[in-house]
Amino acid sequence: MSPSVAELLLQRLERTPPGPEGGLCSLEAAAALGLDHQTLVGAVKSLQALGEVIEAETRATTRWELSAEGEEVLRDGSPEVRLFRSVPSEGLPQSDAMKLPGAQVGFSKAMANKWLRLDKGAPGGPRIFRAVDAVQDVVQSSLRQVQEGNGGSLSERERTDLKRRKLLLEVTLKSYWIRKGSAFSTAVVRQETDLTPEMIATGSWRKLPFKAYNFSALGLPPTCGHLHPLLKVRSQLRQIFLEMGFTEMPTDNFVESSFWNFDALFQPQQHPARDQHDTFFLQDPAEAPELPANYMARVKKVHSQGGYGSQGYKYEWKVEEARKNLLRTHTTSASARALYHLARQGKFTPVKYFSIDRVFRNESLDATHLAEFHQVEGVVADRGLTLGHLMGTLQQFFTKLGISKLRFKPAYNPYTEPSMEVFSYHEGLKKWVEVGNSGVFRS
């Protein structure tokens, strides 16, 4: 069995003289063993965890390395020399010279070194000629010295110039100076990290070496502080609405009057949904203090006598029922308020509204029903809207949500006509499930 990296390091360290002067540089040791430096660093840290087997002191050294551009110059020569060699004895049009690779930098450097001259009055336009017979590529020679490990022989001015031209990089290397510890040994003894039931039962734990606790380790981050799945879905839905040009409606009133929750939406006062078995009514305050008088009169007339193409429900509409406070059963009450305020503006402006908030129902609790849940609401107000516009908007919304297989089924809502239920095909359940309700508001 071949020795491990840690064992190879200990064997090499054993041959070093004792005392503070003896030891190994991790960079030199990695090169001598033919290993990647990070692999050797891992072995050093493993040996440090064993106790006083070794001592490791962190050191930092700086060295110069060629950049990607520097590697190119080392291989092909500097831009100024390449341009000089590209200029024939009869000269070269400046426009052609500028098309060569690295010509911009090469031309300025060659002109500064007085290797080339520019004749602006030459026939056919400015022309470049050689000003000397031959040149030496000092930049390439300097980079070759760095590549061969002799970068220290370069002057500070030469290094600064190469660095400014982005041909040279100053790299800081972190390494370790490794020495023998007080408990040095070439044999690596495996330390136990877990106390198992078998060790306790057999008593073998008494003779086994255990790894000491590392109280400086960060440990695993605690699994807490995550967003609730409902908040994640809410954020996703909100982003989809905003991408489609919708504006969020204010929905900060969990307590709503029966007028806005039911009556303004053409829901009769004898409707089963308004019964205490389906709705949470408030005892204090039991009634809403104010309702818009003119609008309430129009709503009362439509319920009692009809209007706007409707026959009404033909019953005695009571303001006492409309004033009753409740926990809103849907956020469509917010849509009714928003449309009411839109109508009062005088000049009509097309709008798109949405809301995502809690609603409350006096439901029997089971696996699929809660007394409190979230409703996603969207409303579009414009002239000339049709059922096709509604279906297109729904298709766009659900497609952004990742639901593309949709079906629309005719339905009845008190406040919309026509109305549709929206179904999506569930790949897991292998059936169509209802995902929404929709319709065109009665005018």
From Swiss-Prot:
Enzyme Commission (EC) number: 6.1.1.20
Subcellular location: Cytoplasm
Catalytic activity: tRNA(Phe) + L-phenylalanine + ATP = L-phenylalanyl-tRNA(Phe) + AMP + diphosphate + H(+)
GO biological process: phenylalanyl-tRNA aminoacylation; protein heterotetramerization
Binding site for Mg(2+): E417
A GO CC term attached to the entry: cytoplasm
Matches recorded under NCBIfam families: pheS, PRK04172.1
Family: Belongs to the class-II aminoacyl-tRNA synthetase family. Phe-tRNA synthetase alpha subunit type 2 subfamily.
Name of this protein: Phenylalanine--tRNA ligase alpha subunit
Gene source species: Gallus gallus (Chicken)
UniProt gene name: FARSA
